[in-house]
């Protein structure tokens, strides 16, 4: 397997990271509910999480019934964070499918430690390109280029090669 890259994918609002290594996991815009309980105490349900690896599918009996879940681990430090719901047996619990539970003891708020790599958190407009400079070379560039001799070929005379 190639080298793993930990990054930020469309972060909006407050950022949350692994409590052990501070790797970005998700953001507040992905939050579905804080009213969950994990094996270590309170847990939070998120729509998506990044920089995680998933364990094998298992069938588990939970407080809301049987679910098919995968454990979720931090990609950097391999800390167990929680689990992802693959499938719910009960029709009333299907809203959890493909969402991730992260236990509150395993993540923390990251306060301004990570910038948005897409630059969408910038407030000012990007500078306008200087088209005049890009179309015409500078005098110094003209002198440093090799000069080629142009030969015009007319249709009436024979062309020399």
Swiss-Prot record:
Binding site for Zn(2+): 18, 21, 74, 77
Leader sequence segment: none
Pfam families referenced in this protein's UniProt entry, alphabetically: Yippee-Mis18
Classification via InterPro entries: Yippee, Yippee/Mis18/Cereblon, Yippee_fam
Protein name in the entry: Protein yippee-like B0546.4
Record's keyword terms, sorted: Metal-binding, Zinc
GO molecular function, one term: metal ion binding
Compositional bias ranges of the Low complexity kind: 151-161
GO cellular component: ubiquitin ligase complex
UniProt similarity note: Belongs to the yippee family.
Highest taxon of source: Eukaryota
Disordered: annotated segments: 117-161
Domain Yippee: residue ranges: 14-111
């Amino acid at each position: 397997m190639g080298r793993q890259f930990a990054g930020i994918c469309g972060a909006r609002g407050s950022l949350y990271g692994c409590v052990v290594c501070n790797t970005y996991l998700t953001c507040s815009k992905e939050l579905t509910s804080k009213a969950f309980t994990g094996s270590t105490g309170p847990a939070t349900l998120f729509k998506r999480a990044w920089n995680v690896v998933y364990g094998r599918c298992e069938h588990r009996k939970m407080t809301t019934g049987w679910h098919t879940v995968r454990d979720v681990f931090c990609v950097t430090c391999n800390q167990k964070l929680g689990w992802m719901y693959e499938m719910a047996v009960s029709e009333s619990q299907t809203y959890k499918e493909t969402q991730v539970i992260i236990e509150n003891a395993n993540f923390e708020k990251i306060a301004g430690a990570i910038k948005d790599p897409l630059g969408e958190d910038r407030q000012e407009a990007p500078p306008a390109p200087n088209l005049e400079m890009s179309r015409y070379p500078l005098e110094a560039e003209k002198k440093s280029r090799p000069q080629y001799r142009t030969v015009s070929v007319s249709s009436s005379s024979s062309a020399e090669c």
